[in-house]
């Protein structure tokens, strides 16, 4: 009879789905399975027809029960054919035999209940089902693994507060733990999970698990009705127990008017439109200021900007035209150093006494080994603290008349006088040995050597031919050559390009004087240390005693007091006057200027000399009450 009812139910369910024209859904199949289970409960749980364990649970960790499905054999039950046996897998009881279920009734049909006497925690259990003596299913577990508490009881809620708008409210939900769980003594620790939803909704909203028996629920609408349920689990387990009964929450209406939906400000749309507007403004600004922004980010490469020059000439590589334009302008001057004659100098170093052994000055200066190239360029750049001789504003006559730059050197004065005396003697010897009266002045090619005073300058040496025909006023008398020094010293170069020569010393008595006493001057000069400001009496007496003109032997030597260490001004003045009278020979010729200035440079080896005024006479020696200084001694000594 039951089989016919089952077949009829399945036929009715299939016919209803066929007539409705819709496909079978899981809900329809579920309703059909429920109908089948109501007609025959054992058919849906175990299709194989053999008994099988469904679950084992412990509600409070003190007792547990196991359930299984009953086997069906041709639709008839076999009473007492299914049995449950268990064994505790303890080392002490491992040798024991399987024991049968202690209680088949307390937990319901097809179940076995184990009370606290048969329950042991932390000890594994193994159970098995037998049907007519044969094992059909087996399972092993421990009690703490199968804990599933009973549902909480006594659910209720309390209104906490209502929003100012009268739309939302907050409630507090409370419940009681399962009555059979010993929670207060701490035998079992439970966690609770609350779920709620609106009555018409299908999706439950879950809250986080809590250990307390109360939890607040926020933002519930006053015009809605809610369902609330709670379930629990052991803290160390993941399996929840059954849900509690559903609690319905109906919030009171606080306003007589119907609650309207909350006005939600469209922040998202405002942000989107704001970003879009800012982007548009940025693009407009960039396009409007495109050139300026380009200049700031990528500045243009500067082009050559020279006044009066076309940049196309530089691009096309026409450098000759560019140089021509630059040469025309005042601010540009081509650096043709080889043609710049006023920076050329000639130097003769006569201060080194060691060079005397190498031959005469004439041989050394006229030899080709001492000639240097005209391409050597230099310029004096000296800041020694002394008065500079390079003063373009000073006239040539001032240089000839003044002795500031070439006669005030206290250290180099004796050496310069010695060199001039040697050169004078050499000049007179050459005049006697060479036919000056027979040879025309044009055939003479003297070498003009220019020397500095104290400090070296970058100079250019070379042979310069003197064109004497351009100066007939100076060389008209051949006898005047004896009174002209062979060498000249350049002291300055005027801005016009002329060379200014320093005034030299007058010729001395004659060839006999130079031949007889060449060593006297050197002896006097070597006896004095020119670095001292004053001089010893013995040295001065020796120098004055052997002074030139030895033929005047009857003159009276100056008397010096042996007790005085220094020479007084009065004694030296007297000696200078007596020696000066002996030097003045009645047959001496009229002195002529030793040096002159260069008027024109015709060629690298030709000079045109200017006539210069006679040098001023030596300054008088001013006697004073004191000792003799270096400058005064140089005036007195020959």
Curated annotation (Swiss-Prot):
The keyword Membrane applies. A motif (UbE motif) lies at residues 340-349. Changing residue 344 to D: No effect on GHR-mediated GH internalization. Residues 289-638 are cytoplasmic. Changing residue 342 to L: No effect on GHR-mediated GH internalization. Residues 294-379 are annotated as: Required for JAK2 binding. InterPro entries: FN3_dom, FN3_sf, GHBP, Growth/epo_recpt_lig-bind, Ig-like_fold, Long_hematopoietin_rcpt_CS. Residues 30-51, 573-592 are annotated as: Disordered. Disulfide bonds join 56-66, 101-112, 126-140. Residues 1-18 form the signal peptide. Changing residue 349 to A: Impaired GHR-mediated GH internalization. Greatly reduced ubiquitination. The modification Phosphotyrosine is found at residues 487, 595. The modification Phosphoserine is found at residue 341. Receptor for pituitary gland growth hormone involved in regulating postnatal body growth. On ligand binding, couples to, and activates the JAK2/STAT5 pathway. Residues 19-264 are extracellular. A motif (WSXWS motif) lies at residues 240-244. The soluble form (GHBP) is produced by phorbol ester-promoted proteolytic cleavage at the cell surface (shedding) by ADAM17/TACE. Shedding is inhibited by growth hormone (GH) binding to the receptor probably due to a conformational change in GHR rendering the receptor inaccessible to ADAM17. On GH binding, phosphorylated on tyrosine residues in the cytoplasmic domain by JAK2. Changing residue 350 to A: Impaired GHR-mediated GH internalization. One of its GO terms (biological process) is endocytosis. This is Growth hormone receptor. The keyword Transmembrane helix applies. It is found in: Cell membrane. Glycans are attached at residues 46, 115, 156, 161, 200.
């Amino acid at each position: 009879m039951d089989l016919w009812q089952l077949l009829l139910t399945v036929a009715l369910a299939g016919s209803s789905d066929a007539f409705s024209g819709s496909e079978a859904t899981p809900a329809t199949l579920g309703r059909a399975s429920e109908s089948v289970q109501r007609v025959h409960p054992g058919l849906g749980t175990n299709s194989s027809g053999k008994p099988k364990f469904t679950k084992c649970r412990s509600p409070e960790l003190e007792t547990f029960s196991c359930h299984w499905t009953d086997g069906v054999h041709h639709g008839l039950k076999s009473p007492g054919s299914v049995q449950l046996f268990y064994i505790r897998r303890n080392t002490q009881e491992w040798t024991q035999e399987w024991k049968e279920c202690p209680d088949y009734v307390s937990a319901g049909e097809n179940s076995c209940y184990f009370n606290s006497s048969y329950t042991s925690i932390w000890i594994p259990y193994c159970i098995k089902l037998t049907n007519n003596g044969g094992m059909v299913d087996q399972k092993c577990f421990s009690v703490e693994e199968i804990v599933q508490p009973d549902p909480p009881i006594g659910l209720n809620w309390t209104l906490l507060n209502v929003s100012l708008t009268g739309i939302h409210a907050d409630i507090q939900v409370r419940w009681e733990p399962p009555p059979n769980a010993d929670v207060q003594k701490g035998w079992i620790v439970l966690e609770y999970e609350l779920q709620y939803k609106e009555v018409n909704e299908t999706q439950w909203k879950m809250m986080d698990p809590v250990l307390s028996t109360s939890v607040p629920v926020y933002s519930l609408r006053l015009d809605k009705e809610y369902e609330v349920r709670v379930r629990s689990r052991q803290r160390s387990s993941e399996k929840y127990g059954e849900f509690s009964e559903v609690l319905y929450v109906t919030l009171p209406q606080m306003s007589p008017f119907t609650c309207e939906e909350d006005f939600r400000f469209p922040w998202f749309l405002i942000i989107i439109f704001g970003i879009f507007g800012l982007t548009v403004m940025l693009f407009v600004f960039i396009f409007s200021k495109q050139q300026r922004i380009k200049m700031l980010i990528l500045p243009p490469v500067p082009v050559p900007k020279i006044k009066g020059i076309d940049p196309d000439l530089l691009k096309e590589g026409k450098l000759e035209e560019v140089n021509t334009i630059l040469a025309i302008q005042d601010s540009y001057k081509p650096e043709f150093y080889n043609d710049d004659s006023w920076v050329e100098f000639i130097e003769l170093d006569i201060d080194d006494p060691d060079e005397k052994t190498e031959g005469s000055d004439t041989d050394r200066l006229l030899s080709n080994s001492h000639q240097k190239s005209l391409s050597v360029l230099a310029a004096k750049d000296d800041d020694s603290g002394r008065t500079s001789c390079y003063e373009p504003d000073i006239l040539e006559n001032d240089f000839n008349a003044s002795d500031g730059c070439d006669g005030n050197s206290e250290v180099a004065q004796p050496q310069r006088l010695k060199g001039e005396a040697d050169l004078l003697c050499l000049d007179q010897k050459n005049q006697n040995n060479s036919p000056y009266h027979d040879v025309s002045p044009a055939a003479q090619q003297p070498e003009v050597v220019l020397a500095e005073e104290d400090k070296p300058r970058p100079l250019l040496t070379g042979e310069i031919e003197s064109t004497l025909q351009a100066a007939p006023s100076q060389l008209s008398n051949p006898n005047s050559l004896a009174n002209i020094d062979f060498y000249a010293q350049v002291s300055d170069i005027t801005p016009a390009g002329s060379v200014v020569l320093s005034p030299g010393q007058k010729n001395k008595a004659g060839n006999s004087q130079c031949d007889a006493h060449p060593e006297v001057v050197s002896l006097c000069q070597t006896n004095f240390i020119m670095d001292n400001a004053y001089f010893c009496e013995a040295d001065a007496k020796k120098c004055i005693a052997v002074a030139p003109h030895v033929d005047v032997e009857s003159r009276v030597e100056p008397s010096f007091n042996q007790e005085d260490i220094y020479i007084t001004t009065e004694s030296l003045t007297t000696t200078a006057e007596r020696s000066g009278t002996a030097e003045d020979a009645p047959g001496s010729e009229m002195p002529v200027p030793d040096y002159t200035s260069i008027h024109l440079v015709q060629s690298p080896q030709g000079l045109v000399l200017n006539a210069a005024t006679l040098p001023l006479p030596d300054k008088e020696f001013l006697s004073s009450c004191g000792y003799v200084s270096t400058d005064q001694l140089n005036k007195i000594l020959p």
